[in-house]
């Protein structure tokens, strides 16, 4: 990662033991990289699924909440983890200039219901989500001013409960399918932007030990490799529930710019309240 001034300044405002730049170096023979198995990570993983990268790395794919736990347990060395988990690490390092963010509407993280927002009495929370659930709570209490009952879920059955005054937070590829079914769709990234004027960062690449500058440069290059092939990557997925070309190019933001890091900072500040 480039040690630019904005990153260094921002790192000082992250949780006390979270850093953007390494202090020491660790050497690993085969680095395990935990990534999210959603469509939005396909461009990031494009440069990691080649023989050269896989000679020194192993990819582990799962949904966001599991990747965070795998990092904590040492199952993976680097993980694309929900931003909401950053304060839970005793010490953490953001090791890439890339992640999963949205400048406006993200399309794949939404609250779905059959009634308007003010009439929702119960919300079922997607079991695959951490940052999205935290964002929903912030929007409810800080901006929407609603207090429905929140229900944790454990399996895919929760989507069938979107009826009457019961709503559900749905993330990832399943959100595209749910968009076709629900009457009301509240895009959480768009709502966040409307209230704060900032982008929202959903996930960042994190390690619990510092990585070498050489490795960070290589890892950034791997993340960047797919950015010039978004149309080709979209076409290769053969996905019909949503226009992936539009999704990759206009809904998802991959580079962690200064403005996007400001959005992350604001989210972490509000997260302390909850």
Question: Predicted regions: what is each one?
Answer:
Residues 2-3, 16-274:
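Domain-level signature for soluble enzymes in the chorismate/prephenate branch of the shikimate pathway
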Residues 10:
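Cationic, low-complexity basic patches in intrinsically disordered or flexible, solvent-exposed regions
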